[in-house]
Amino acid sequence: MRLVIARCRVDYVGRLTAHLPTARRLLLIKADGSVSIHADDRAYKPLNWMSPPCWLVEDTVEDAEALWVVTNKAGEELRITIEEIEHDSSHELGVDPGLVKDGVEAHLQELLAEHVETLGSGYTLVRREYMTAIGPVDLLCRNADGASVAVEIKRRGDIDGVEQLTRYLELLNRDPLLAPVSGVFAAQQIKPQAKTLATDRGIRCLVLDYEALRGTESTEFRLF
């Protein structure tokens, strides 16, 4: 991973255009090729980014400014004009063991994989932990029509979970063998804000009854 702290301005050129005026920012260049621009707020969320597969070309323009152009396979560009670099370092992090889910969440995934018809009549499981460039989606399924469906499972469903599934869907829908891919956000509890965001993005919400999945109570589920 490469960490760069620099005064820079950023322009995104593609389906939409966006501009970040000059400011001090953190630039992250990861081993998977992704590039993201961060401010000193917003927790882990970048101001702008380019997901892999993408390619970074560094060049020098007038006034000794550096121009980084990150291009994805669709031809969209993230253009970073660097006025001054304050820090530039690279670090080898090695292979990460990945997120270890708590017992209930991991068991929910296992149970839903075993009873995939809970998602709807005619659903079949393609794979658990289907890997994407930014991590594994919990379940990849096909619905009764044979269309791909990505399922993200949480114990408590909040906005971050919806954002996570949105990123998975963006990547999966770039694969012509899978597209179009729809999403299901499944959790024991789903916060109203998360439900609203999911609905706005065309993601279906499913509230899971853990005890019912284990076969100890009613098998009724609430669909939104």
Curated annotation (Swiss-Prot):
Q: What GO cellular component term, any one, is given?
A: cytoplasm
Q: Which UniProt keywords apply?
A: Cytoplasm, DNA-binding, Endonuclease, Hydrolase, Nuclease
Listed Pfam families: NucS_C, NucS_N
Task: Answer yes or no on keyword Acyltransferase.
Answer: no
| Location relative to the cell | Cytoplasm
Q: E.C. number, please?
A: 3.1.-.-
Instruction: Show the Gene3D superfamilies listed in the entry.
Output: 2.70.180.20, 3.40.1350.10
Q: Name one GO molecular function term.
A: single-stranded DNA endodeoxyribonuclease activity
Q: What class of enzyme is it?
A: hydrolase
For this chain, the family text in UniProt reads: Belongs to the NucS endonuclease family.
What this chain does, per the entry, is described as: Cleaves both 3' and 5' ssDNA extremities of branched DNA structures.
Q: What is this protein identified as? A: Endonuclease NucS
Gene designation: nucS
